[in-house]
């Protein structure tokens, strides 16, 4: 009997181990309902905030244009009013950011990435009003900025706000709701739910903790924010470019060349953004008055351009359908591209509350259209359509700059409803991303976050030195 005991205990121990393993697997798959419910709340609030922000920007732009109509008979007065209206709105946005919440300046996406890494604080009680109303000022003034930056940062901060209000505990809940809000913000900004999900998974892949809980929460938040957007807006593509023709297989090599062009330009564009940040910082030197006046001058310039050359100002959504339809000459496309590169650098690098997604989409469209027009002339036997290159190029600069090709491809497809162009878009985006990686340089948001963290560390070191010096005295 004694010799049989070990043989009987071994199967029992094995069964216990199997039961324990199965129990662990089942428990790991149990998603706390509280987090999923909070994700739905976050998505709903983010969607409503994004709709309010979008409507507010549109209202301000209409009011600004209405003021110009009353001075149409007096050209010098018209230019003066165009400059002053945009300058005042821009200065309002710069003032709010500099005075009350410096972390609300710029895109805001690097701030969310830093918060997901526990390296940046989330002060939602001050960021939410400053980013919302400051963004209304800068975007309503016609500056070359996108609304996705504000909605992503607003979304992330709403996620943290809900966490604090309902007093949810745990690092996983904090991280999940922060990511959910950011994804919901991008989805609501562009009416692109799948792009919002991919944005978190791809662009924020170093920071996003991919778990069953987090991905379910992100899905729920994105669904709710998109529903809120579509309740108040039409359920159609955000940018109406019509149905374009497909790209024949024997023309796909042209899209690879287009991707190579963007792969060269993307890292250069990133260096220009960072260089312009340094230049403008030397101009204002951290002085709040100089910074606000500089912002007013940039905003006023965009206001003038909005009247003289409308295609060179604003986020660029109105420009994209016109360029895709081939309504610009080659010379005009070159002028628009150069002008918008300059205005994008000035507006975004100055620290104005606003994103860079939309301006980069517009730049990619213009450059893609120009390339398409050249290809049409050089290869008439292919019966090409320049608009297909415009759509392919639309997300290519985004892919080369922030190194998120999937997000760029899906975002453009959802915004334009031209899914038949997915293959040329993949080729263009992949070519742009690979070459951008080979040429070196960090993705834009990563580079901006690294600068922010370096500045934060320097400020903390300076405060500690000052504190130690005061103790010694």
Swiss-Prot record:
A motif (Selectivity filter part_3) lies at residues 355-359. Residues 1-32, 117-123, 167-176, 202-214, 282-287, 439-473 are cytoplasmic. The chain crosses the membrane at residues 33-69, 77-100, 124-141, 148-166, 215-232, 253-281, 288-309, 330-349, 355-376, 422-438. Residues 70-76, 233-252, 310-329, 377-386 are periplasmic. InterPro entries: Cl-channel_ClcA, Cl-channel_core, ClC. Chloride binds at residues 107, 356-357, 445. A motif (Selectivity filter part_2) lies at residues 146-150. GO terms for molecular function: antiporter activity; voltage-gated chloride channel activity. The record marks 148 as: Mediates proton transfer from the outer aqueous phase to the interior of the protein. Keywords: Antiport, Cell inner membrane, Cell membrane, Chloride, Ion transport, Membrane, Transmembrane, Transmembrane helix, Transport. A motif (Selectivity filter part_1) lies at residues 106-110. It is found in: Cell inner membrane. It catalyses: 2 chloride(in) + H(+)(out) = 2 chloride(out) + H(+)(in). GO terms for cellular component: plasma membrane. It is a multi-pass membrane protein. The record marks 203 as: Mediates proton transfer from the protein to the inner aqueous phase. The keyword Cell inner membrane applies. Residues 109-116, 177-189, 193-201, 387-401, 402-404, 405-416, 417-421 dip into the membrane without crossing it. Homodimer. Proton-coupled chloride transporter. Functions as antiport system and exchanges two chloride ions for 1 proton. Probably acts as an electrical shunt for an outwardly-directed proton pump that is linked to amino acid decarboxylation, as part of the extreme acid resistance (XAR) response. This is H(+)/Cl(-) exchange transporter ClcA. The gene is clcA.
């Amino acid at each position: 009997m004694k010799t049989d005991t070990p043989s009987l205990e071994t199967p029992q121990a094995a069964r216990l181990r199997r039961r324990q393993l199965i129990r662990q697997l089942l428990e790991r798959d149990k998603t706390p309902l509280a987090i999923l419910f909070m994700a739905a709340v976050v998505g709903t609030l983010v969607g409503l905030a994004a709709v309010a922000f979008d409507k507010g920007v549109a209202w301000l732009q209409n009011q600004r244009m209405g003021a110009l109509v009353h001075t149409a008979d007096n050209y010098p007065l018209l230019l003066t009013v165009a400059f002053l209206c945009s300058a005042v709105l821009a200065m309002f946005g710069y003032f709010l950011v500099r005075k009350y919440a410096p972390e609300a300046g710029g895109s805001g996406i690097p701030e969310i990435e830093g918060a997901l890494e526990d390296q940046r604080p989330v002060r939602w009680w001050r960021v939410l009003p400053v980013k919302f109303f400051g963004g209304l000022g800068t975007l309503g003034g016609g500056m070359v900025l996108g609304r996705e930056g504000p909605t992503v940062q607003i979304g992330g901060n709403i996620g943290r706000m809900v966490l604090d209000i309902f007093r949810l505990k745990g690092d996983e809940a904090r991280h999940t709701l922060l990511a959910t809000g950011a994804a919901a913000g991008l989805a609501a900004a562009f009416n692109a739910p799948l792009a919002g999900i991919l944005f978190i998974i791809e662009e924020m892949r170093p920071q996003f903790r991919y778990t069953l809980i987090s991905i379910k929460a992100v899905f729920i938040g994105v669904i709710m924010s998109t529903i809120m957007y579509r309740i108040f807006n039409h359920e159609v593509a955000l940018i109406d470019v019509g149905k374009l023709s497909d790209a024949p297989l024997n023309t796909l090599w042209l899209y690879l060349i287009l991707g190579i062009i963007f792969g060269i330009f993307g890292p250069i564009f990133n260096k220009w953004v960072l260089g312009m940040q340094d230049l403008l910082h030397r101009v204002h030197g951290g002085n709040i008055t100089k910074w606000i006046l500089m912002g007013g001058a940039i905003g006023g310039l965009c206001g003038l351009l909005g009247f003289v050359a409308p295609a060179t100002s604003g986020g660029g959504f109105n420009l994209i359908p016109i360029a895709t339809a081939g309504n610009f000459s080659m010379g005009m496309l070159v002028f628009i591209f150069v002008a918008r590169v300059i205005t994008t650098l000035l507006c975004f690098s100055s620290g104005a509350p606003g994103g860079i997604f939309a301006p980069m989409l517009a730049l990619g469209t213009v450059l893609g259209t120009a390339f398409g027009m050249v290809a049409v002339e050089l290869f008439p036997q292919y019966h090409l359509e320049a608009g297909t290159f415009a759509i392919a190029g639309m997300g290519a600069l985004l892919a080369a700059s922030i190194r998120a090709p999937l997000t760029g491809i899906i975002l453009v497809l959802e915004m334009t409803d031209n899914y038949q162009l997915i293959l040329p878009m993949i080729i263009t985006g992949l070519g742009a991303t690979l070459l951008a990686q080979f040429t070196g340089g960090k993705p834009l948001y990563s580079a901006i976050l690294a600068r922010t963290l370096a500045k934060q560390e320097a400020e903390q070191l300076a405060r500690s030195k000052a504190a130690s010096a005061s103790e010694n005295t």
